[in-house]
Amino acid sequence: MSLGPLMLDIAGTELTETDRVRLSHPLVGGVILFARNYASPAQLAGLTAEIHALRYPSLLIAVDQEGGRVQRFRDGFARLPPMRVLGEICDRNPDRAHHLASQAGYVLAAELKACGVDLSFTPVLDLDYGQSCVIGDRAFHREPQVVADLACALMNGLQSAGMAAVGKHFPGHGAIRADTHVETAIDTRSYTDIEKEDLIPFRRMIDAGLSGIMAAHVIYPAIDQHSAGFSSRWLQRILRHDLGFEGCIFSDDLGMQAARNYGSITRRAEQALQAGCDMVLVCNDADAADELLGSLHWEFSAASLARVECMRGQHMIHSMAQLHEMERFLQAADEISKIDPAGISVSL
């Protein structure tokens, strides 16, 4: 059985029989984990092993493990700083900030890989305009070139541990106050304004080999009436054609309020896939997931399947015990632990 275009979640720290049946459906291609699915590194490793064993090829396992307030796995994992802290260090010592970003990416990826998680939806490429409460300190910086530099460094760290990077939220979520989890979000700027600011990190990352992008549930009416994740203009014309992106496109969660304007969960999935998403996420709504599995008819193209498969990366580290014997990891984790929330590194 090949993979499908849906990424779903599960209820708890162990698979239930309902989870197993749901994840065995041919439309499913991935699982996203949350804090409720985590108790310890050993438990997580057992859970991911069971998920991977359900199917061949195995389901893709993802998580939002960015650092700061968006870090699903905490106890037993290195505490990662908010990305804004790296931006603040960059204002004083760019070389040090780039080094720490790479180290943070390595630690993040190495720990997840050691527990069987394939990828994290990171880095955040949104600019810190000081407008968005939902983005806030998740963003590296206000200046697009600084964001691009730090994100490229973090991606290098991820890749050195065998993990692909996913840039989000295309084409930029930082300039609006609205939280797409709970309301419709509209960015009234022109394409020219977005291109000369928000698209710079995406363009730089694409040129550097970015593997995945997550689209924003934000409407940019000067460009298209549909939000980016439902817009073929954004995903196919601008992202694929103009920016030359050849990697995997993920939707943001189709259960968010900003996505509900597009009809039933099945209609939302259809429109996102038709617009150009390779894989769509449905989170925190088991009834919607079951409805979708019973009603969606979608032929997963060979091209989309290949792009999803490329998100697996490599499993070079097989356990936390092995990881904690590696000098490179110990050094990187030590450096990251010495960064405090005020953006001060003891090595500065």
Curated annotation (Swiss-Prot):
Its EC number is 3.2.1.52. It catalyses: Hydrolysis of terminal non-reducing N-acetyl-D-hexosamine residues in N-acetyl-beta-D-hexosaminides. It is found in: Cytoplasm. The record marks D179 as: Important for catalytic activity. The active site is at H181, D252. GO terms for molecular function: beta-N-acetylhexosaminidase activity. InterPro entries: Beta_hexosaminidase_bac (IPR022956), Glyco_hydro_3_AS (IPR019800), Glyco_hydro_3_N (IPR001764), Glyco_hydro_3_N_sf (IPR036962), Glycoside_hydrolase_SF (IPR017853), NagZ_Beta-hexosaminidase (IPR050226). Transmembrane segments: none annotated. Substrate binds at D64, R72, R138, K168, H169. Its main location: cytoplasm. GO terms for cellular component: cytoplasm. Pathway: Cell wall biogenesis; peptidoglycan recycling. One of its GO terms (biological process) is cell division. It comes from the Bacteria. Pfam families: Glyco_hydro_3. Keywords: Cell cycle, Cell division, Cell shape, Cell wall biogenesis/degradation, Cytoplasm, Glycosidase, Hydrolase, Peptidoglycan synthesis. Belongs to the glycosyl hydrolase 3 family. NagZ subfamily. Plays a role in peptidoglycan recycling by cleaving the terminal beta-1,4-linked N-acetylglucosamine (GlcNAc) from peptide-linked peptidoglycan fragments, giving rise to free GlcNAc, anhydro-N-acetylmuramic acid and anhydro-N-acetylmuramic acid-linked peptides. This is Beta-hexosaminidase. It comes from Nitrosomonas europaea (strain ATCC 19718 / CIP 103999 / KCTC 2705 / NBRC 14298). The lineage of its organism: Bacteria, Pseudomonadati, Pseudomonadota, Betaproteobacteria, Nitrosomonadales.
